[in-house]
Amino acid sequence: MQEQYRPEEIESKVQLHWDEKRTFEVTEDESKEKYYCLSMLPYPSGRLHMGHVRNYTIGDVIARYQRMLGKNVLQPIGWDAFGLPAEGAAVKNNTAPAPWTYDNIAYMKNQLKMLGFGYDWSRELATCTPEYYRWEQKFFTELYKKGLVYKKTSAVNWCPNDQTVLANEQVIDGCCWRCDTKVERKEIPQWFIKITAYADELLNDLDKLDHWPDTVKTMQRNWIGRSEGVEITFNVNDYDNTLTVYTTRPDTFMGCSYLAVAAGHPLAQKAAENNPELAAFIDECRNTKVAEAEMATMEKKGVDTGFKAVHPLTGEEIPVWAANFVLMEYGTGAVMAVPGHDQRDYEFASKYGLNIKPVILAADGSEPDLSQQALTEKGVLFNSGEFNGLDHEAAFNAIADKLTAMGVGERKVNYRLRDWGVSRQRYWGAPIPMVTLEDGTVMPTPDDQLPVILPEDVVMDGITSPIKADPEWAKTTVNGMPALRETDTFDTFMESSWYYARYTCPEYKEGMLDSKAANYWLPVDIYIGGIEHAIMHLLYFRFFHKLMRDAGMVNSDEPAKQLLCQGMVLADAFYYVGENGERNWVSPVDAIVERDEKGRIVKAKDAAGHELVYTGMSKMSKSKNNGIDPQVMVERYGADTVRLFMMFASPADMTLEWQESGVEGANRFLKRVWKLVYEHTAKGDVAALNVDALTEDQKALRRDVHKTIAKVTDDIGRRQTFNTAIAAIMELMNKLAKAPTDSEQDRALMQEALLAVIRMLNPFTPHICFTLWQELKGEGDIDNAPWPVADEKAMVEDSTLVVVQVNGKVRAKITVPVDATEEQVRERAGQEHLVAKYLDGVTVRKVIYVPGKLLNLVVG
């Protein structure tokens, strides 16, 4: 073998071997235990970033480890290829989204191969191909027939100048990102899938997911937002309809002093006919899109509609206000307000001088002080007529029962979760397979017209979707009648909700899934991706699995047994202030830094001499220009070094700080491994190891080898603390580097140790391990080698360390056989120079001996 470690030479050779041998291609095999290891599929943006590299390295380490345990391991990869960025890039580069996307896929595929990930490339799929989305379209038509799909109008961002719908991220400060026109809210018909029909199951089955992070399960629980409460109907004077509200706090009902409705509510619209102030307010609300997250912090505004509702229990008239914090799409679009016991209602009532009536006593039984804020804690009722003196639960039930008996209340379970709106008014997505006949009938596209193919050879003007701009595209005939196709496309979360199942049978032509293959591989054993997908993707992913189960395609309830959310990758960030006060972010690669004695950055400048402000470590991002290109790092150090650093620098689920000094450290370690194998093999063949003829030192070294195997196995397999596994291997390597290699048995022991080290490192650094395994004459390819097993006998300690004290002060530490008697330990202690010195000429009055641990000689 060559003396120097040259990753640029070995890595491409090993990758070619894997390609030619199709090493990682698998098929169903009932005789073997399966393991399905899946990383979230990437969006083909053009280049891999470090976040991808971290995600996929973790997946590859787990997959390779499980393979070495003898399992049938599926690790597939594909491309989440539809989506808005492709449209923007196509307009910018004067091309169409399809060629841009396919070019990116080709480029990124090479990058993935360059990193040595062991994927089954025969299963690669791109979600923008008709071969893939045809089954999604077919499935949608089936869901429609089952009554799980419906159409209703829903508000979107509308640019009146471009006459087009904008995604939320295309609205900048209330204006269109392209033409700066003020964006309006417009109601348009859209398609929805009834995820709410599965709300209870999605909620309850979270309890089955023992190996999902609690944070993710909590986020999903809150997102589904199940609550138990009462729906209450109010009569409204001089208004044709009643108003219905939902509350989870009927115990506070006697303190309800006003109602609030959404600006889009029919009652507000009616009142606005004769109220210009209200009309202007409704207009303002219509054009400010409020994300639910912003609701809490925004200023609460409202206008009195002039209508009065009648409190069903007290008969009092209470005002009805239109307010910007009530959303039409949530609940009934109307809420009851109890300002004494809800902080938002309190702030609104204080601002507009509305009545604040306390009905719950403070914890000490006194009337609450509402001069500064509402009392939101539950407690005992007062000021509530017949319900005075009841605690929260009793009051909840008594008031709910009374309202029900009167016919104006109904107990209800409510969900925050809304049905999934899957319509997008974009081009680069899968066409929604619905048609409208000449007579207005809406129906699914017939099977013989599926897939509805998205034309790829299009011209993008950046304004209107090409399939909306071309009236001919939509024309078709159904049942002999002219019909128009739907020109909206699916939300791209549709494609990523079932791709994991299609990987099990990517070539299957008879339907969406081949149940036999799907049920062999599913559920996924471990799913790896970012926590930012906790609610949207991971909820739709679970929902789709249940839909496919109910269609008879899969027989499990949940798609993935374990979820691992990897931490973000951080890097140093620097900027200088430009002439106009703007921040110009400078890549850490271009920053020349000075550090203090602790290695902290104290000064920085760039090549042009700008003084740089160092803002610390932050997530690698385009906006801060602090991304590090993985390709540059692989070209500089090799893929194995980058992979090793990624797994060593931090626990998988914590943030990782990118430090090139750490990358250099990982590289030095691999050079040491190479050097040790080189020096070992240069001495020729090795005799067989005779474990019964080892010296004490050899036994001790062999014990370290097998203890390391046991620790690394536990760290990777059970604990998934990959960084501590690598640390243990590094510690063993330090011992091996110092071990004698003079005798035949020394070299035989070194051979056993190196074969173990190379196999333990293989999941992390597969190229160097593949090569060194061959140099060590390991059996077959390392890709088919079994994981090393710790020898229990070798790990048994036959000696132990005893601390020797004289009058309670430590004077020596001695190694004695495990079965040594107290006499033998005393005799051995007496041979130590320091112990002998303190025993000279004195009498030992007392001996305290803790077997195998401590010998304390009390002298006087």
Swiss-Prot record:
Taxonomic lineage of this organism?
Bacteria, Pseudomonadati, Pseudomonadota, Gammaproteobacteria, Enterobacterales
Know the name of this protein? Leucine--tRNA ligase
Q: Which domain of life is it from?
A: Bacteria
Sequence motif: 'HIGH' region, positions = 42-52
Could you give one GO CC term from the UniProt record? Answer: cytosol
User: Where in or outside the cell is it found?
Assistant: Cytoplasm
Transmembrane segment boundaries: none
The gene is leuS
Q: Which reaction does it catalyse?
A: tRNA(Leu) + L-leucine + ATP = L-leucyl-tRNA(Leu) + AMP + diphosphate
Q: Where does ATP bind?
A: K622
